[in-house]
Amino acid sequence: MLIMVVGAGLVALTLISNLFAVGPAFENLITDFRPALTEQSIKTAHADIAGLSAVQTEFSTKLVPALSQQLKMTPEQFNGFVSQNFPKVAAGMGALPTAIPTFDGLINTLDQQRPLFASADAIPTESLPATTVPWAWVGAGILVFLIGLAALRSPKAGGAAALVVGLLLLVVPLALSLPGKAADADQLNANLKPIYTQALVDNAKGGLATIGAMGTEMGTTMLPALATQLKMTPEQLQTFLGANFPATAQALQTMPASLERFNGLVKVFDNNLSNYETLKPVGLARLILILMVSGGLVAALGAVSIVTARRE
């Protein structure tokens, strides 16, 4: 009878823990984030951030003073000129001091999570997706329940089956390193909780839109207008920028690709926010522990059933 209770408990826990929703949510999130957490992706993201940071520094400390002098303005007058005539450039430059540390912190956090992510990515194994976990859990519960039912009719045979299945439920998670993987997944969950929010997604979208508009207006409107005022051709202006302001010149070429990569990362966060909300309350290490304890209990009850049947 107790064996049946354990089996029913495993099935009930699957439903109570919402594992049939958690499994797909976990798998979808892991699959979508996997490309963003490669070593190369992290290095590229750091390079993109460094490029934006260099533009911010160069614009305020070199480009503004130099262009102000060329146009016979003070730096303050030039900044006012930019704000009035190229508001998107002004807004973008104003957003960079906040956006750069935000994205740098986000990328650093993701980089730090890579070992935990790799471990969680192997739940239950590297070749089996997480969507198999709830089915395996329910299957184990039903099997244990049926074994308990059989033990009522044939204590010796049912007890032997309970002993074998119980030991499997105890040993297989250890063989698959599930306790460690589950603990890593829980730690990953805990580390992401402070940052993985709707506010993060909304702020990142807004910041990228502002910076993207800055790059577009700078390249298509501001620089051609400045070239006219400086009596330069567009080609001469590009040469002038490349020689004197290399970070800005390079950013004009690389910013579209950089922003596309950042937008792709933000899209991954946005698309998986509901998945994260689904799995966030679930403690996987606790569930694995319950499964193993249940296996040990079933094995013990099976052994007792065998001994009792022999005495009779």
Regions found by a protein language model. Name each.
Residues 12-133, 174-292:
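Extracytoplasmic/ectodomain regions of membrane proteins and secreted proteins
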Residues 1-15, 131-180, 287-312:
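Juxtamembrane interface at the cytosolic side of transmembrane helices
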